[in-house]
């Protein structure tokens, strides 16, 4: 092959790679099965696979950064990331700060505690419930149930450790996430099931981007629609959130 032709092909391929959009995702890998570190210390989970599928559809180069949950939106606003995917509830309060994608998962919240002791929020009066710091679960308890002692943690893992050791009486979080811990903690059960107050838990989970980046949110929404219609989304759901895991 002519050397000039080879040079042209290489240049074309390199320019295509250089022109590929780069999207920096941030997440807080403390919330399996949505996001956590696997046995090889790699980010994995429903949100991670979803973001990768969206990037593939958008033909974008995507990277992921792990950070504390309560720093995700501030970091996005200061342009340290381009998008946040971390099981974020789409709420009116958050929507004042960022732009959300279309919902990608219908979410609810549940309280986990030792079996047989609690069944209503009133049962937890004067008791301690662990939440992730900066979460909608924290705000819900503080606003709606000040009679309950809200204890904030940097991760669900820390919250469940204290619950198992008797330092708290419950953990309040995403239904799917708290059910993940029940698999390996048979002494625990669901005390309060599937709270769906839309003022706090919104209309589902969404991907957050800067309010001044409408082009990116349009691309994400288009890619999300496409993977929901070509079967990719259902495969990710079946892998990470089997329906039988959240029925009870």
Give the ranges of each region predicted by the language model.
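Alpha-to-beta junction loops
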Residues: 59-61, 77-86, 128, 146, ...
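Acidic, polar ligand-binding/catalytic clefts
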Residues: 52, 56, 61-123, 187-200
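Ligand-binding clefts/hinges and TM-proximal coupling segments of bilobed small-molecule sensing domains
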Residues: 139-153, 189-195, 222-248
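Periplasmic-binding protein-like
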Residues: 29, 105-112, 175, 179-222, ...
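Short loop->beta-strand "edge-of-pocket" segments that line small-molecule binding or catalytic clefts
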Residues: 23-29, 121-135, 149
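Short helix-initiation/N-cap motifs at beta->coil->alpha
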Residues: 31, 48, 63-74, 116, ...
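Extracytoplasmic small-molecule ligand-binding "clamshell" domains
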Residues: 21-87, 230, 243
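Extended ligand-binding regions for polar small-molecule ligands
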Residues: 48-57, 117, 123, 127-128, ...
């Amino acid at each position: 092959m002519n050397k000039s032709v080879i040079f042209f092909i290489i240049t074309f391929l390199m320019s295509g790679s250089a022109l590929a959009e780069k999207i920096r995702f941030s997440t807080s890998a403390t919330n399996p099965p949505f996001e956590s570190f696997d046995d090889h210390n790699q980010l994995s989970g429903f949100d991670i696979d979803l973001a990768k599928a969206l990037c593939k559809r958008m033909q974008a180069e995507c990277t992921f950064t792990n950070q504390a949950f309560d720093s995700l939106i501030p970091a996005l606003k200061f342009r340290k990331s381009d998008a946040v995917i971390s099981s974020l509830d789409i709420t009116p309060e958050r929507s004042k700060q960022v732009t959300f994608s279309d919902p990608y998962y219908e979410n609810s919240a549940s309280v986990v505690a030792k079996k047989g002791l609690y069944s209503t929020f009133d049962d937890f009066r004067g008791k301690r419930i662990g939440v992730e710091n900066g979460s909608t679960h924290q705000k819900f308890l503080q606003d709606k149930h000040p009679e309950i002692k809200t204890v904030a943690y940097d991760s669900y893992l820390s919250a469940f450790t204290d619950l198992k050791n008797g330092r708290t009486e419950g953990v309040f979080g995403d239904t799917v996430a708290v059910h993940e811990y029940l698999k390996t903690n048979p002494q625990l059960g669901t005390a309060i099931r599937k709270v769906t107050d839309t003022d706090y838990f919104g209309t589902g989970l969404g991907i957050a981007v800067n309010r001044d980046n409408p082009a990116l949110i349009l691309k994400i929404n288009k890619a999300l629609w496409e993977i929901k219609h070509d079967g990719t989304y259902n495969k990710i759901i079946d892998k990470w959130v089997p329906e039988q895991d959240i029925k009870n």
